[in-house]
Amino acid sequence: MNPKLVKQAVAFAAEFSEQNNERIVVLVNEQNETTEVRPYLGDNFSYEQFLNALIINYSDGKKFIDIDSINSIHCYKQKI
């Protein structure tokens, strides 16, 4: 996995979220496993290269570290 591309994908997701009133769904494909939908809606998240993980900082102060092997990140506009 290319850390630079993942960082760019996370930055794109954050910008895409802002442009669409934070109505996005982030779809994370895990290595040789099922696909999960993780709605990091309105939460601050970033890619940590050293951990190879997504760090999600929830608005209530809790933190989630997604350490699954990430193959790709796709952003979809959520239908309201």
List the predicted regions and their residue ranges:
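Eukaryotic intrinsically disordered, low-complexity regulatory linkers and tails enriched in Ser/Thr/Pro
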Residues: M1-K63, S69-I80
